[in-house]
A protein has these predicted regions:
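Thioredoxin-like thiol-disulfide oxidoreductase module
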Residues: 41-65
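Alpha-helical interaction elements in eukaryotic regulators
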Residues: 18-21, 48, 52, 79, ...
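Structured loop/turn residues at secondary-structure junctions
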Residues: 16-17, 44, 75
Length: 93
């Protein structure tokens, strides 16, 4: 199975069903008028969870097993809290 890579501009959010922080990060990005691609990872996790987590680890440069998994311009940001901090810093002006 091929996994969808993060987009080169804007945000990419890897999420899953029944994930409250996945919903919160989508709301947060919308509130800050940021464009984002949301990828529901339910099928990835069912088909091959280990391979998906390896894919994320390779992209992120470190292990990250919790959702959401957020990238900005294909660079790993982290989860909800990290994304919130980045948005506050970016929009501080």
């Amino acid at each position: 199975m091929e996994f969808t890579a993060p987009v080169s501009s804007g945000y990419t959010v890897y999420g899953k069903s029944d994930c409250s922080f996945c919903e919160k990060v989508k709301d947060l990005l919308t509130e800050f008028n940021e464009t984002f691609l949301y990828i529901n990872c339910d099928e990835y996790l069912i088909a091959n969870k280990a391979a998906f987590l390896q894919f994320i680890e390779k992209l992120a440069g470190k292990e990250h097993k919790t959702f959401p998994m957020v990238f900005s311009s294909a660079k790993f940001v982290g989860g909800y809290s990290d994304t919130f901090k980045k948005l506050i810093e970016t929009h501080a002006d």
